[in-house]
Amino acid sequence: MSVTVAVDCMGGDHGPVVTVPAVFAFLRSHADARAIAVGREEVLAPLIAPVAKEFGERLRLQPATEVVGMDEAPATAMRNKKDSSMRVAIDLVKSGEATAAVSAGNTGALMAISRFVLKTLPGIDRPAIATVLPSRDGRTYVLDLGANVDCSPEHLLQFGIMGAMLVSAVEHIDRPTVGLLNIGEEAIKGNEVVKQAGELLRTSGLNFKGNVEGDQIYTGGVDVVVCDGFVGNVALKTSEGLAQMLATFLREEFSRNLLTKLMAIVALPALGRFKRRVDHRRYNGASLLGLRGVVVKSHGSADAFAFEQALGRAADAAANRLIERIEERMSAMSQEAA
């Protein structure tokens, strides 16, 4: 399936300096893909002109006169900036001109605009934010990461379904394993919402493996970890802080004296492999699941390499029918319940 990704080129901490080169790299690595660069024409046109011949019809510019600020209130952005690069990118998905949209802009605004323009899929009460993290077994998908602070058991069930369909689509795993994040593996652990969610997941037809603790996000064991947005966001930010601390400690210890500097040289190949495995840029791109269209949120501080990963993540989800998979699963569950 050929995909067209609408790119909010003005969003994020760095804007076109990062997003435009990332679009070029994405098109070079995805020969069948197309991209629509959305943003201020006077800014983007000079950047795109030098590669116009290389990409031809695979890359076009869609003018948008406004930009959503990183600290702007979502309601304000939705009401007052209907020609923002973020809004126009989502509108392109709604109209069918694009099969996915990617933005590094304001998360709250992106979720609000996406939900308003695209609407949620049948059977989905609330969209959720899902991302992939490195684990000992390969990678683990976690949701929700902050879109929904307070959740019902039914919401957590829907997150499990959407997460499983995401992994099935992009990792090509027929029956992804699903775990429910809890304070212990026993079914009696957790608050009432989590315990009831566990019961719903056990009878859902998903490949549910029961409760998992926080360490299993990284030690592996399940493909999808389900939690509410409060817990998920805390877990994610804690992980990011820990990774930064470990990197700082390694740099400090290896630069302490001549001997440790020599040890660093000897260990360089292993350190390089370690860095590649835990490089957060490789995992950039959180999917906004539950919408009638593929939308991926890049980290606001992403560099060109990281933003390219988000573009690839969006293209993979669209090409592998993520939205249709979720619709089909929700429809099947609705028929079973009837």
Curated annotation (Swiss-Prot):
Question: Which Gene3D superfamilies does the record associate with it?
Answer: Isopropylmalate Dehydrogenase
Q: Which domain of life is it from?
A: Bacteria
Enzyme nomenclature, EC number: 2.3.1.274
- Subcellular location, record wording: Cytoplasm
- A GO CC term? cytoplasm
Select a single GO molecular function from the record's annotations and give it.
Answer: phosphate:acyl-[acyl carrier protein] acyltransferase activity
Pathway of this protein?
Answer: Lipid metabolism; phospholipid metabolism
Which biological processes are named by the entry's GO terms? fatty acid biosynthetic process; phospholipid biosynthetic process
Q: What broad class of enzyme is this?
A: transferase
Family in the record? Belongs to the PlsX family.
Q: How does it assemble?
A: Homodimer. Probably interacts with PlsY.
Give the protein's recorded name: Phosphate acyltransferase
